Amino acid sequence: MGIYDIFDDESARSISGMSIDEMAKKYGTPVIIYSRARIVSNIRRIREAYENRVRMLYSVKANDNPRIIEIMHQESIGSDSASPMEIMMSIFSGIPPEDILYSPNNASEYDLNFALDRGIAINFNTFTQYRKMREKPERISFRINPGFGMGEFAGTTTGGARTKFGIDPDAAILAYRKAREDGIREFGIHMMIGSNNRDHVKIAEAYSNFFRIADRIGREAGVSFQFADVGGGLGIPYVQGENELDIAALGSAVLKEFDRYHFGDLVLEPGRYLVGDAGIIVGTVNDVHNGFAGTDIGMNLNIRPALYGARHTIIPVGERVEGEKITVTGQICENTDRIGDTAWRLSEGDRIMVLDAGAYVYSMSSRYNGRPRPPEIMIMEDGKDVMIRRREDFSDFIATVV
């Protein structure tokens, strides 16, 4: 899984035979382009690594375009949803309620009962959330904070001290006991410790610790788990030199450890790993001055660099000529509106690409500074381009005004 794998060859001029430059001319810029073939390849790579013994739930937060969720459904993948709207997007895209796991945090009674009324299993972030329920669901899970976290950035580390996620193992024992006393008979257990992890040894160790903790919780609470959900967080490289996740080695190690226990299904919640490297942003350089390349790709579209300090590979469309390092910026009135640096020579009018933009880009975008969101285009396996979301216009800005 390399950062250029979405393209037909190292020239990075086409995807599935479709010219990137021609796509920019056809749809304008900025535009987000996805490869369906790449998404499917990523799905099947996980399946092969886990010997078809894993149940996958797509992390909708990574990219909530219904046409992408439809691909997941076509590939027999369920939904990991974090809000009522993600639940509705999943159902709209064909995923049945029984294949959805709702994992909210700080949920309102409305949020929780929304899932309950649709027969969707709830993964509770706290015991107090469970106690809010109007009625008790048939199936529940609790999110465990195992006492450790692991993520690319502090802001994407979701386990351990000083995080708002999950309950500690001792509290979980009491929570499962109470749920059992309430008559619930179907249980799962869940963990999510952080995002964009690429060290298969450390990931496998974290999963092993989770299985051990889950086994103790089950024994002491007197419940058996129909599934053990290790969450998502499987990472991809964003720039040259970053290591790739050895998914085959991870799958082998995890299955070996999982087989020591009796948890029912092993569940994964991949998002970034499935769609992250399957998307690119194509933009235009509008101005070059003082070491900055001013483009139409800003933090309104890709907030990750400003939010986390995340890096993306940025390359010209077409010929690449080495130059001095230049900082790529957008059109937003903030000095944090920086997408990253590149050493390729850029001139006014050039097309550029921001790679690995399939996850946490459009789904985290905004209309800040009155900038409409761009169209999203899917390139099919046969090379045909399909618009799966149009470019926004003024009517979208005032659609909710009353």
Swiss-Prot record:
Cofactor(s), by name:
pyridoxal 5'-phosphate
What pathway does this protein act in? Amino-acid biosynthesis; L-lysine biosynthesis via DAP pathway; L-lysine from DL-2,6-diaminopimelate: step 1/1
**What keywords does the record list, in alphabetical order?**
Amino-acid biosynthesis, Decarboxylase, Lyase, Lysine biosynthesis, Pyridoxal phosphate
Task: Give the first-level EC class, as a single word.
Answer: lyase
N6-(pyridoxal phosphate)lysine: residues carrying this PTM: K61
Keyword hit for Ribonucleoprotein: no
Top-level taxon in the UniProt lineage: Archaea
Q: What SUPFAM superfamilies would the database entry show? A: Alanine racemase C-terminal domain-like, PLP-binding barrel
Record-listed substrate binding positions: R272, R304, Y308, E334, Y360
Gene3D superfamilies attached here?
Alanine racemase (3.20.20.10), Lyase, Ornithine Decarboxylase, Chain A, domain 1 (2.40.37.10)
**Function according to Swiss-Prot or TrEMBL:** Specifically catalyzes the decarboxylation of meso-diaminopimelate (meso-DAP) to L-lysine.
Please give the name of this protein.
Diaminopimelate decarboxylase
What is the species of this protein? Thermoplasma acidophilum (strain ATCC 25905 / DSM 1728 / JCM 9062 / NBRC 15155 / AMRC-C165)
Taxonomy of origin reads: Archaea, Methanobacteriati, Thermoplasmatota, Thermoplasmata, Thermoplasmatales
